[in-house]
UniProtKB/Swiss-Prot annotation:
Highest taxon of source: Eukaryota
SUPFAM superfamilies: Zn2/Cys6 DNA-binding domain
Cited Gene3D superfamilies: Zn(2)-C6 fungal-type DNA-binding domain (4.10.240.10)
Species classification: Eukaryota, Fungi, Dikarya, Ascomycota, Pezizomycotina
Family label: Belongs to the ERT1/acuK family.
DNA-binding region boundaries: 97-125
Pfam family for this entry, one: PAS_13
Region (Disordered): 1-90, 158-203, 236-285, 322-387, 442-461, 598-629
Role, per record: Transcription factor which regulates nonfermentable carbon utilization. Activator of gluconeogenetic genes.
Gene Ontology biological process terms in this record: cellular response to starvation; gluconeogenesis
Keywords carried by this UniProt record: Activator, DNA-binding, Gluconeogenesis, Metal-binding, Nucleus, Transcription, Transcription regulation, Zinc
Protein's UniProt name: Transcription activator of gluconeogenesis PAAG_01030
Organism listed in the record: Paracoccidioides lutzii (strain ATCC MYA-826 / Pb01) (Paracoccidioides brasiliensis)
Polar residues bias: start-end ranges: 158-170, 189-203, 248-279, 339-359, 377-387, 620-629
Length: 808
């Protein structure tokens, strides 16, 4: 490009040829705007030909000749102001429009931006598309739509735009060489004031639900023709629902809200008219992301007792399943869950349904299991998105991103139904009639009255599953109302110390005392700052945790016990009672503990092979004496040390000292010997030691003598009124239901022959009767057990959970 100077004034450049390159066009625009400094706006960037110093500036024309002094002064002042370090910095836009992105120029947050308005491109100004990251490669385009925060109404920005538009119209900004063509174009396009009015109209409370609809309509209406050919920018890819559903409403008439203008036309209403019938449920808040209806969360239908837990569960499911929102696969059904396949929708949910239809995704049924009208015909489970229901508006795309469109796998069965696992074939066969076993849409009130509810499909849950007899619902609120005072752990430790001193020898007592003494400083450090309220809260935490464990213990078939940190039994499963013979009432201290089986120990510490007498706290007299020292209204549960033999007790407390304040997630897996529950009636005739003397504790007995009848000085022992020397065998049925046959023959061999119960072998264990025979000879059941310590909020050991499996 050349220019000449005649008579002190620059002559206009010759006309450019019709085929100009983009660089020449940009240079020409830059030269034109350099002659009109008033055209520059603070929100628009200079052309690159000026900013990089290679174009026109500092009074030089394109060919390097000097310009007149007046023009040189204006250009120099303008260029100096642009390099002023104190000039206000332009705010970086969150996302540039398509035109500014192609030109690599700074854009603004408003739409249309100032640069597109000055160039007459306001009708095609829209957000540019960024290159997808690798982790978003499989995400649909609608999930990548920028948030509505950038498109919200900004009153201050709109006022500035209006002032700028008025000043531009007064000053006449279109003074370039293409003035005529621009004026011709402007006749067919709205003015800047009209654009500002259309794009930044005040969003009243009546159109809060149409945010994404307006954004999508602007993108589809003002998209250039060249972009329409691009598959990645095709607005048809944005026809699916945005991440947040625009149909939420908590008003009394939610059916008037529409999904899009096309649906509104089908239903005979318009977005503005339908929205104006309902007030804004949020008041002054235009967009409340914490509201549950934003993500189609129906709090009432979720199986939660509180709002915050349901919201947290819903958001976790929303994050887990809402990113890709791909059609459901067979893996969802193999897990026993319908998954997103249950989220079938029709047009009735978006504006033209009856008043009985619920606007939420999950419907009005609080159990989350009824999803289809009961009278509906055969349904194809693969056609879950209703591709022809909304005439192309929702083709192959579900409604919003919901929490797996009904967490069927987390729904707990009620007390009137039995848990059943759904097979895969029920979902894979399109000809199967779903109405015979479940429903996919919330049925209307009329359908509820006409037809009974079909059985619901659900995955077995351990929380509220029906075990044995019908269970009544328990509320944890009773725990917080009933606990009024802290638990006296001091009395528990005193009782434990007294029991250990009575049962164990001094040497074994010292080993247990050393283990407990090692954790005593930690107990003191963690409890010295606790007051009365903290101790009450600690007991509430214990009872609340125990409330959860009781349900799992009842549903689990493993022998399990739960005890406090003092070793007092707090919960027990029926399998443990079957294995050991200890009744639940006895373990919890509700019935007297009459056990005499201590694994061979005695009060004096002498082995059971000696001729010592048994004097245990477990006798009826001793139990009454111990209970007299307990606080009023408190019973004394059985200690864990009473259930194990001597070596197992010592090993347990040594491991407990390491785990109590050590690894909070640690566990111990080892072997032990559980003591069977034996009273005097059971034990005297069942056990004798190797010397032929009666041993109530059972002691360490030989194989040949372990099952023989009790022998004192050569005479048989009478049981239940059976006289000595009787020729008939005496049969004793103890409190546990065990039948003990006491033969007249004193030999162990004849005893084995005459007692069918004692003839059980390990290969013939079957049912409860077989479990009762474990440890029948010596009163000990060899087990492998695993236990762990659970701490409370003060990091103090709260309870011990133990699982046992017998070694057979």
């Amino acid at each position: 490009m050349t220019s000449s100077v005649r008579n002190g004034s620059p002559s206009p450049s010759p006309a450019l040829p019709s085929t100009t390159t983009p660089a020449e066009q940009e240079s020409r625009n830059a030269m034109t705007m350099a002659n009109n400094p008033g055209d520059w706006d603070s929100s628009e960037s200079r052309p690159q030909s000026l900013s990089n110093g290679k174009g026109i500036g500092n009074g030089m024309v394109a060919n390097g000749h000097q310009k007149p002094s007046t023009s040189s002064t204006a250009a120099s002042a303008n260029n100096a102001s642009a390099k002023d370090p104190l000039r206000p910095r332009r705010k970086k836009a969150k996302r540039a429009c398509f035109a500014c992105q192609r030109a690599h120029l700074t854009c603004g947050d408003e739409r249309p931006c100032q640069r597109c308005i000055k160039r007459g491109l306001q009708d095609t100004c829209h957000d540019g598309v960024r290159k997808k990251a690798k982790y978003l490669h499989d995400a649909p385009n609608e999930a990548l739509i920028p948030g509505i925060r950038g498109n919200l109404y900004n009153q201050a920005q709109a006022a500035r735009n209006k002032v700028n538009s008025n000043s531009q119209q007064r000053n006449g900004t279109n003074s370039n060489s293409d003035n005529n063509s621009t004026n011709t174009n402007s006749n067919n396009k709205p003015s800047h004031q009209d654009v500002s009015t259309n794009f930044f109209s005040t969003p009243s409370a009546n159109n809060y639900h149409n945010v994404y609809t307006q954004a999508k309509s602007r993108q589809s209406q003002h998209m250039p023709s060249r972009v329409m050919q691009d598959a990645t920018m095709n607005p048809s890819a944005f026809q699916a629902q945005p991440p947040a559903s625009p149909t939420f409403d908590l008003s009394s008439n939610p059916q008037n809200h529409t999904l899009s203008p096309s649906i509104a036309q089908n239903s005979g209403t318009t977005p503005s008219s339908s929205a104006s019938q309902n007030p804004d449920p949020y008041g002054s808040t235009f967009f409340d992301p914490s509201h549950p209806a934003l993500f189609n969360f129906d709090i009432a239908s979720m199986n939660f007792g509180n709002r915050y837990g349901a919201l947290e569960f819903g958001m976790l499911g929303h994050l887990a399943t809402g990113a890709g929102d791909t059609p459901p696969s067979d893996t969802a059904t193999r897990r026993g869950s319908i998954g997103r396949s249950s989220g079938t929708f029709t047009v009735q949910n978006f504006g033209e349904g009856s008043s009985n239809q619920s606007p939420f995704l999950f419907g009005g049924d609080p159990v989350l299991n009824d999803w289809n009208p009961a009278g509906q015909g055969p349904t194809n489970p693969r056609n879950i998105y209703n591709q022809n229901s909304v005439s192309g508006q929702m083709t192959d795309h579900p409604h919003a991103f919901a929490i797996e469109s009904a967490p069927m796998n987390f729904a707990s069965p009620t007390s009137t139904e039995s848990p059943q696992m759904t097979t895969v074939t029920q979902f894979d066969d399109p000809s199967v009639n779903f109405s015979s076993r479940t429903t996919l849409m919330p049925p209307t009130n009329t359908q509820h009255q006409q037809q009974p509810q079909p059985p619901r499909i659900s995955t077995p849950s351990l929380k509220n599953m029906q075990v044995g007899v019908k269970r009544r619902y328990r509320s944890p609120s009773s725990i917080y109302e009933s606990v009024k005072e802290p638990y006296s752990y001091t009395s528990g430790f005193h009782s434990l110390t007294a029991f250990i001193q009575r049962r164990f020898s001094p040497q074994k007592t010292l080993q247990i005392a050393k283990a407990l003494a090692s954790i005593r400083p930690s107990f003191i450090a963690t409890t010295k700052t606790l007051n009365q309220d903290d101790l009450i809260f600690m007991e509430k935490c214990f009872q609340r945790t125990l409330w959860e464990y009781e349900d799992f213990i009842d549903a689990c078939g493993t022998p399990t016990i739960v005890c406090r940190r003092t070793g007092e039994i707090a919960a027990v499963g029926k399998e443990f009672s079957i294995l050991t013979g200890w009744k639940k009432e006895v373990l919890l201290g509700k019935e007297p503990n009459l056990n005499v089986n201590t694994g061979g120990s005695s009060s004096s510490g002498v082995s059971s092979r000696g001729s010592s007498t048994y004097n245990s706290r477990n006798s009826a007299t001793t139990t009454v004496m111990d209970n007299q020292s307990l606080p009023a209204g408190r019973t004394q549960p059985v200690f864990l040390a009473e259930l194990l033999d001597d070596d197992s007790v010592i090993e347990f407390y040594e491991d407990f000292a390491k785990l109590a304040f050590g690894d909070s997630r640690g566990s111990v897996m080892t072997t032990c010997k559980l003591l069977k529950y034996k009273t005097k009636e059971d034990g005297v005739g069942l056990f004798r030691n190797s010397n032929g003397e009666v041993s109530a504790g059972g002691g360490d007995t030989d194989a040949n003598d372990s099952a023989g009848a009790g022998v004192g000085d050569g005479t048989t022992t009478a049981v239940n009124g059976v006289s000595n020397g009787s020729s008939n065998n005496a049969t004793n049925v103890n409190a546990n239901g065990n039948v003990n046959v006491i033969p007249n023959d004193l030999s162990g061999a004849s005893s084995m022959k005459s007692s069918p119960k004692q003839a059980w072998g390990k290969s013939r264990i079957a049912g409860e009767a077989g479990m009762n025979q474990l440890g029948f000879r010596d009163g000990k059941v060899e087990c492998s057990y695993c236990w762990t310590v659970k701490r409370d909020v003060f990091d103090i050991p709260m309870l011990i959970v133990m699982n046992f499996l017998p070694c057979i």
